[in-house]
Amino acid sequence: MENFPTEYFLNTSVRLLEYIRYRDSNYTREERIENLHYAYNKAAHHFAQPRQQQMLKVDPKRLQASLQTIVGMVVYSWAKVSKECMADLSIHYTYTLVLDDSSDDPHPAMLNYFDDLQAGREQSHPWWALVNEHFPNVLRHFGPFCSLNLIRSTMDFFEGCWIEQYNFGGFPGSDDYPQFLRRMNGLGHCVGASLWPKDLFDERKNFLEITTAVAQMENWMVWVNDLMSFYKEFDDERDQISLVKNFVTCHEITLDEALEKLTQETLHSSKQMVAVFADKDPQVMDTIECFMHGYVTWHLCDARYRLHEIYEKVKDQDTEDAKKFCKFFEQAANVGAVAPSEWAYPQVAQLANVRAKDDMKEAHKPILSSIELVE
């Protein structure tokens, strides 16, 4: 990968991990695999249904990869919620990743969005129809305030993906545009609100902490994602509308300056996240800390982000940042590097084929008359 600023990336990653005092102890290996398989199995059966297969029209390999990535994110990061909640969130966030990777123009299917919403009709856009059907399974885990955040943030995400269809990085001088788009498609409020299921938290009692967590998480989780994604997106044609690249266009600065801007904002947000909740409800702080550490582990271990390539490149270097990065990477791999073959089975395509064959058999069964049934 030509011209990638490896040394800068190492220094930034190390500072981030030091700021949050990274030490992922969320699970034993057995617990991690158990939760991964539970969430995956339920989600895989969901997406293997004929309706989902027909309406999503996603390449089976891409759907499989998306599901595995999202299950990893949810299980690693939402370490305090129930397995059932993990599974339902995995389905919801897989839908969002499928939309994020889509290139379909949403305009025609959105012409009657509000009229259909008001009348209680099924949405014309297939993604909305499926997401709305699943939403009750997600919202049952949360109180009304957190639920409203999940709904609103999901709508924002759809709009952000719509904007990204135009591959528009903003006009030069439009300084607000990069952060506007990143907040829109970052799902920060959805993530921030989904950490507080009602079986663990009374949202009225913890209202101030939850509200603050939603506010802080909006930037922290998307900025960390942007930093950890920077390597995989650096020369990928599909990922040229990123926050860093949009900083370059709108602020009319160099790539190095844009990366430094993101770095400083991410580090400041990390400091805030730790400092603000340090003296608050211990259960709240524990939930946030587990999320932060699990979220980092997921990025370091998931193949989507290709950070093992950085590790292999620098593991024999003698610089302080290289040694620290490798130590953090190995620490993450020790707890989070679990082969999909240990938990991501059966494949969605296999389940879908079994369902299709069963439906064919059912369709070819002889129909008995009422007389034959009596006889």
Curated annotation (Swiss-Prot):
It catalyses: (2E,6E)-farnesyl diphosphate = trichodiene + diphosphate. Keywords: Lyase. Pathway: Sesquiterpene biosynthesis; trichothecene biosynthesis. SUPFAM superfamilies: Terpenoid synthases. Belongs to the trichodiene synthase family. The keyword Amino-acid biosynthesis does not apply. Transmembrane segments: none annotated. It comes from the Eukaryota. It comes from Fusarium austroamericanum. TS is a member of the terpene cyclase group of enzymes. It catalyzes the isomerization and cyclization of farnesyl pyro-phosphate to form trichodiene, the first cyclic intermediate in the biosynthetic pathway for trichothecenes. It serves to branch trichothecene biosynthesis from the isoprenoid pathway. One of its GO terms (molecular function) is trichodiene synthase activity. The keyword Lyase applies. GO terms for biological process: sesquiterpenoid biosynthetic process. Trichothecenes are sesquiterpenoid toxins that act by inhibiting protein biosynthesis. Its EC number is 4.2.3.6. This is Trichodiene synthase. It holds the Pfam family TRI5.
